[in-house]
UniProtKB/Swiss-Prot annotation:
InterPro entries: aa-tRNA-synth_I_cd-bd (IPR045462), aa-tRNA-synth_I_codon-bd_sub2 (IPR020751), aa-tRNA-synth_I_CS (IPR001412), aa_tRNA-synth_I_cd-bd_sf (IPR008925), Lys-tRNA-ligase (IPR002904), Lys-tRNA-ligase_SC_fold (IPR042078), Rossmann-like_a/b/a_fold (IPR014729). It is found in: Cytoplasm. It comes from the Archaea. GO terms for cellular component: cytoplasm. Its EC number is 6.1.1.6. It comes from Methanocaldococcus jannaschii (strain ATCC 43067 / DSM 2661 / JAL-1 / JCM 10045 / NBRC 100440). Its main location: cytoplasm. Belongs to the class-I aminoacyl-tRNA synthetase family. This is Lysine--tRNA ligase. Keywords: Aminoacyl-tRNA synthetase, ATP-binding, Cytoplasm, Ligase, Nucleotide-binding, Protein biosynthesis.
Length: 530
């Protein structure tokens, strides 16, 4: 059984509810990356697991748009220093294209979630506060200040100061959340505050967006507002004494609410060179979710994040995207070959379920696919710079030479193929190896430096090419056959070929590569050396 189904089953056993609310959230303080997506996709998998069990469920997403800007991040201009301490929703867009700072980073992520097949209800914290959703919770927190302090102090090395209050007023003068409570009148429900930034003082009701609860109180408050029953969280929140532990006590003792079941997930680290570094928006170590569909289909990201338990650490290496896509293609193959079988082992059932959870829209029949690496080569050779598009006629010529049957490709597969070609080209140019065929003059120079036996083979192979069946399988066999006839190690034949084509000793699978380059070009290249 897939881990999401196991979690859903346990939740139903442990907690009876008319409707199960699965929550996820993010603070849009910077580019929202693949590491952040693990939380949302974990929540989505659990939600789908609940639906699969036949219960009513909803997936909600709460964007912490009312959190303050905490510092000047590396990607921000110097002038944004003036906004430190202001709620993200009240700060201008850093590029002038959105209504606020928060929306600038949030909107692309929400659009990406739509591409990823995630259906959810989105709430923005600034709107929640301004609509008064938190008003009752704020009143309860203020009236129970000492109890909340007692709970928080249980997990603190240094106790909170006696004048601490579970509220942050938004200064009416400078708009910052750096204020100090001077007095609270419970009967009038008014707070007198002083801004620690500009010195402004006033007395206000802390409602309708005039104030915000601190995180450790805000979180349990929202659980009770939205009736949250389960929520994935990073290991920092779930650590002993972390915000989940304090949230559990505040939910029970202050808000009289049964806290949600926690699902802890591990970080995703981005491979940079030989190092794996935890993704961090604030440090600029990110691969934004919005950039994913430039290099691969959404289901590949879902597969990456949902095939393993949330507690499993993931190292994300952009150079290995082709391997990841190949794994998904094999899984898709398995799904369509086995989905209708009556008897499957537990492992086989789990593979079927991984495919179902990874693929937002499962096609009726198995799509026609070309391996991603091969697509990256074809796309670079068939891209029309003038039209800024793939020349599909040339693609089909190459596929025929590579023994692909393309007569019955359906419309869905055709679109998917073209998308993959464009994505694979983007990947190759940015993260893989750009395919550069060296010039004839360069090839001649390299030829002179080859071993005599390699030179002899190139000329012999050139003659054989003129009458050869020009497809990948025949060319592959011809390389081995001609090398054997001349007593040359096939490895030396391959290296010689790569050298006169690419200027290096390695490259794509040679038979397929030669078929892809085409008969005229290949014969001309191997015949240069008279």
């Amino acid at each position: 059984m897939h881990w999401a189904d196991v979690i859903a089953e346990k939740l139903i056993e442990e907690r009876k509810a008319d409707k199960y609310i699965v929550a996820s959230g993010i603070t849009p303080s910077g580019h929202i990356h693949v590491g952040n997506a693990r939380e949302t996709l974990t929540a989505d998998a659990i939600y789908k697991g609940l639906i699969n069990k036949g219960v009513e469920a909803e997936l909600i997403f709460i964007a912490d748009t009312y959190d303050p800007l905490r510092k000047l991040y590396p990607f921000l201009p110097k002038e944004f220093e003036q906004y430190i301490g202001m709620p993200l929703s009240e700060i201008p867009c850093p590029e002038g294209c959105c209504e606020s700072y928060a929306e600038h980073f949030l909107r692309p992520y929400l659009e990406s979630l739509d591409d990823l097949g995630v259906e959810l209800t989105t709430y923005r914290a600034d709107e929640n506060y301004k609509k008064g959703l938190y008003d009752e919770k704020i009143k309860i927190a203020l009236d129970n200040r000492e109890k909340i302090m007692e709970i928080l102090n249980k997990f603190r090395a240094n106790p909170l100061p006696d004048d601490w209050w579970p509220i942050n007023i938004v200064c009416e003068n400078c708009g910052k959340l750096k204020t100090k409570v001077i007095k609270y009148d419970s009967e009038k429900e008014e707070i007198t505050y002083r801004c620690e930034i500009c010195g402004f003082e006033n007395t206000v009701k802390p409602y309708k967006g005039r104030a915000k609860l601190p995180w450790r109180v805000d979180w349990p408050a929202r659980w009770s507002i939205f009736n949250v029953t389960i929520e994935p969280m990073g290991k920092d929140h779930a650590a002993a004494g972390g915000s989940y532990d304090t949230g559990v006590l505040i939910a029970k003792e202050i808000y009289n609410y049964i806290p949600p079941k926690k699902v802890v997930y591990e970080w995703i680290q981005l491979k940079v060179g030989d190092k794996a570094i935890p993704m961090s928006s604030s440090k600029g170590v990110v691969f934004a979710v919005k950039d994913w569909t430039n290099i691969a289909h959404p289901e590949i990201l879902r597969f990456l994040l949902l095939r393993s338990k949330p507690t499993k650490h993931i190292d994300f290496d952009l150079k290995k995207i082709p391997d990841l896509v190949d794994e998904y293609d094999r899984l898709e193959d398995f799904y369509f070959n086995n989905k209708d079988k009556d008897e499957l082992s537990e492992e086989e059932q789990e593979k079927i379920r991984i495919y179902e959870l990874s693929t937002p829209k499962i096609p009726e029949t198995k799509p026609f696919v070309i391996p991603y690496r091969f697509c990256s080569i074809i796309a670079q050779l068939t891209y029309d710079e003038e039209k800024e598009d793939i020349n599909m006629e040339r693609v089909f010529e190459i596929l025929r030479r590579n023994n692909y049957s393309i007569d019955d490709i359906d419309e869905f597969s055709m679109k998917k193929l073209k998308d993959r070609l464009l994505m694979a080209r983007n990947w190759a140019l940015k993260y893989g190896e750009k395919l550069v065929i060296i010039s004839e003059d360069e090839a001649k120079e390299i030829y002179e430096k080859l071993k005599d036996k390699q030179k002899e083979w190139i000329k012999y192979f050139a003659e054989k090419l003129k009458t050869a069946e020009f497809d990948a399988l025949n060319l592959h066999e011809l390389i081995y056959q001609t090398a054997k006839e001349l007593g040359l190690n096939p490895r030396d034949a391959f290296q010689a070929s790569y050298m006169i084509l690419l200027g290096k000793k390695y490259g794509p699978k040679l038979g397929a590569f030669l078929a892809t380059l085409g008969k005229d070009f290949v014969i001309r290249r191997y015949s240069l050396f008279e």
